[in-house]
Amino acid sequence: MKKTIEVFLRHCYYSKLQELPDRTRPSWFNKHRVFENFKNTLNSELVNYTIVYDEFYGSIDKTFLAQEKNVEIIRCGSECDSFLKTLDIIQSRNFDDDQIIYLLEDDYLHRSGWSEVMLEGFALDSKYVTLYDFDFFINAGFLCETFVTPSSHWRAVPATTNTFACKYKTLLEDLEIHQKYSIDGIKEEELFHFSRDYDKFWELQKNQRYVISPMPGWSTHCDANHISPVIDWNKVMNETNFKNEGKKFTLKY
């Protein structure tokens, strides 16, 4: 059954990016609970999701995702390659032009109602929507246009991370740009490869392909150095109806 939003959620058994010195998790962070939060806050009448799981470092069978049904297995080992493979998977689905595609990384926490808020963002006729209120662009001298929808204020932002939403037609039109900044990603050492997402959205903006984000955010990157402001995300996590609390799973990151 067709749903308005198709989510492609990238997971992996282990990410070497967690070894970088600037990658710090909040004290409340837990990958299993973040996934449960995602499932329990989406509107199932609006959203389908596909897990794109990278088994380069280990099998999905060793994780809390072992019983998930809609899974695409890849073996990449780096953020750049997994993003490029996810783009291939999306293209293979041959969606309608107006299908909303949400490319989501596995360390984003959501507030209830995010599905509806995402649709409000697209009602503003923006090419790209992020639910993450990236604090990098606060008090930084950036001028922006602001908007309002029934549930939120919005602002135009210069860039965002590789978690974003757009329509399928937009993704295809901009595909070469998305590919370029992952093919030519940041490569600090073997498998420490990650996309130049910031640079990518700057180029898209120059082509008048703008991205907007809500204020405050309806999601946050679970990076202790860049949490979406205003919202108590620890409270959001604790309010999640987390099932299987007593089960033990292995996940190496």
Each model region followed by its residue ranges:
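C-terminal catalytic/acceptor-binding lobe
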Residues: 1, 26-27, 168, 173-253
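N-terminal anchoring/stem segment of glycosyltransferases
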Residues: 1-78, 91-95
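A structural signal for short, well-ordered beta-strand segments and their strand-loop junctions
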Residues: 8, 48-53, 103, 128-131, ...
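Short, solvent-exposed loop/turn segments at secondary-structure junctions
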Residues: 12-14, 56-59, 79-80, 106-109, ...
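A short, glycine-/small-residue-rich helix N-cap motif at loop->alpha-helix starts
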Residues: 77-85
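Active-site nucleotide-sugar/metal-binding loop of Leloir-type enzymes
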Residues: 86-100
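Short beta-strand-to-loop acidic/aromatic patch adjacent to the donor-nucleotide binding site
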Residues: 97-109
